[in-house]
């Protein structure tokens, strides 16, 4: 404390700018406080593990991007449901006007507690984000999507007006403003973005996200979603997809984590399968030949029987789930 006062006194004596402008004293960081990152589950255990934090970080910007039908909106809706289950408020900024309320309800979202906004233009959307962040009452803001945030000038102009770079400039200015508010808040800002083809690219990656480079810079996390497989039922009908999510940027944990999500068209991510897969991976449930045991007690013979038993015994499933989540959140063992 004495050292801090001495430093502040010396700076005040040597720098008239600080004296004339009544700037606040410098302070030392609280190492414990600044090392703790508050997170809330994404609603997918596979994705929580891939992120390395156990969920989405509060006070940060996150970008979820990918091609069409890759599961982006489903992942965002599961995050909304997870935040609600944690007792937090979520807002969905539906710039595309394509939010399917029946699908959102099937995923587990309480529609009566969901804030939904339909901004007229991009500047309106950013003004809304600022207002919500300042309240510090909204823990998750989903923006669907960056491509649909049309600048006001473009909206009010004519179709033949030149608007090159207008969208990128709006994104850059808007992100600067909201980013200045986030560090003092408990709000996660999740942007859904799309990929576009770069003209004239013959080699390398020919795809780029919309909205310029600002979102790439300000995002603490970036996740790319790719559809890796179409899922069929026993009659050959398409019932879902398998989506690969890659953490392409991560400023709060290790980057390049990968998660494969099983998404059904009528219900979203198959959470029960994720719990079992990760329980087996972390030895919460142990497999020996075709037998499955939990805490040294045999619970099922065969995987189909295992799913059946856990569906009939929700208290057993809950025990396995909680132990699995604990394993995911545990720090890695020290290197030998």
From Swiss-Prot:
ATP binds at residues 66-73. GO terms for molecular function: ATP binding; ATP hydrolysis activity; ATP-dependent DNA damage sensor activity; damaged DNA binding; single-stranded DNA binding. One of its GO terms (cellular component) is cytosol. PROSITE patterns: RECA_1, RECA_2, RECA_3. It holds the Pfam family RecA. Its main location: cytoplasm. Keywords: ATP-binding, Cytoplasm, DNA damage, DNA recombination, DNA repair, DNA-binding, Nucleotide-binding, SOS response. The keyword DNA-binding applies. It is found in: Cytoplasm. Coiled coil: none annotated. One of its GO terms (biological process) is DNA recombination. InterPro entries: AAA+_ATPase, DNA_recomb/repair_RecA, DNA_recomb/repair_RecA_CS, P-loop_NTPase, RecA-like_C, RecA-like_N, RecA_ATP-bd, RecA_C_sf. Can catalyze the hydrolysis of ATP in the presence of single-stranded DNA, the ATP-dependent uptake of single-stranded DNA by duplex DNA, and the ATP-dependent hybridization of homologous single-stranded DNAs. It interacts with LexA causing its activation and leading to its autocatalytic cleavage. Belongs to the RecA family. This is Protein RecA. The lineage of its organism: Bacteria, Bacillati, Mycoplasmatota, Mycoplasmoidales, Mycoplasmoidaceae. The gene is recA.
């Amino acid at each position: 404390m004495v050292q801090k006062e001495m430093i502040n006194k010396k700076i005040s004596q040597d720098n008239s700018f600080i004296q004339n402008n009544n700037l606040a004293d410098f302070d030392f960081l609280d190492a414990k406080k600044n090392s703790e990152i508050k997170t809330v589950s994404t609603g997918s255990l596979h994705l929580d593990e891939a992120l390395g934090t156990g969920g989405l970080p509060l006070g940060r910007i996150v970008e979820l991007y990918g091609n069409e039908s890759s599961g982006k909106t489903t992942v965002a809706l599961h995050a909304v449901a997870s935040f609600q289950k944690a007792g937090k408020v979520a807002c969905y900024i539906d710039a595309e006007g394509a939010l399917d309320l029946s699908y959102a309800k099937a995923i587990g979202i309480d529609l009566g507690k969901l804030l939904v906004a339909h901004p007229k233009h991009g500047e309106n959307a950013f003004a809304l984000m600022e207002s919500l962040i300042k309240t510090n009452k909204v823990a998750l803001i989903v923006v669907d999507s960056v491509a649909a945030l049309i600048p006001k000038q473009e909206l009010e102009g004519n179709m033949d007006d030149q608007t090159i770079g207008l969208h990128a400039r709006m994104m850059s200015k808007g992100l600067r403003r909201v980013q200045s508010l986030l560090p003092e808040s408990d709000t996660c800002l999740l942007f859904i973005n799309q990929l576009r083809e770069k003209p004239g690219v013959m080699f390398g990656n020919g795809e780029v996200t919309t909205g310029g480079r600002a979102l790439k810079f300000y995002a603490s996390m970036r996740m790319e979603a790719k559809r890796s497989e179409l899922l069929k039922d026993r009659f050959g009908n398409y019932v879902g997809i398998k989506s690969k999510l890659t953490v392409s940027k991560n400023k709060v944990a290790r980057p390049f984590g990968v998660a494969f999500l099983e998404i059904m068209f009528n219900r979203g991510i198959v959470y029960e399968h994720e719990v079992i897969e990760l329980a087996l991976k972390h030895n919460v449930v142990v497999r020996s030949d075709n037998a499955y045991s939990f805490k040294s007690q045999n619970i099922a013979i065969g995987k189909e029987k295992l799913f059946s038993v856990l569906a009939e015994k929700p208290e057993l499933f809950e025990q396995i789930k909680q132990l699995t989540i604990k394993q995911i959140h545990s720090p890695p063992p020290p290197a030998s």
